[in-house]
Amino acid sequence: KLDMQLRKVTIETPLNLILDKERFNVRQLREYQNMVYLLDANGIFVFDNLGNYKRKLPVTGVNYINFQDNELYFVQDGSLHFVNLYTSERRSIKLPKPYATGLVSDTRLYLFLPKQLDFYAWQ
């Protein structure tokens, strides 16, 4: 944790105690609803806003995560997966192409290939 007034780190969490240091490959770090989500080759690690480890979502092959309302979402193995942040309930939508990642809004779904963007109406 960083104290902005003192401009100094007040709490540190050593990740090598949690992550497999042989496969340590952080791809993304996001804060959402007072939690910190670290996307790594080993999965999605969830920490509270003080850096305390909470849980791990065992997903691999994911390059990007994002959030919509109370769900975390990501593209994996040809599907768009949603995980409820509070109940851990999962749902998936099969995608028509092998998209790399996607963005979800209230009314649109944006899906990305290496050289193409497709978007769909979304409800």
What are these regions (language model features)?
Residues K1-K21, D40-V59, G78-K97, L117-Q123:
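Surface-exposed loop/turn elements that mediate protein-protein interactions on large endomembrane-trafficking
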Residues Q33, A41-N42, D69, D77-G78, ...:
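Residue-level signal for tight coil/turn positions that link beta-strands
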Residues T101-Q123:
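Hydrophobic, glycine-enriched assembly/anchoring segments
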Residues D20-Y32, V59-N70, P96-R108:
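Repeated scaffold domains used in trafficking and secretory/extracellular systems
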Residues F67-N70, V75-D77, S88, L103-S105, ...:
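Short C-terminal domain-edge/linker segments immediately following a structured domain
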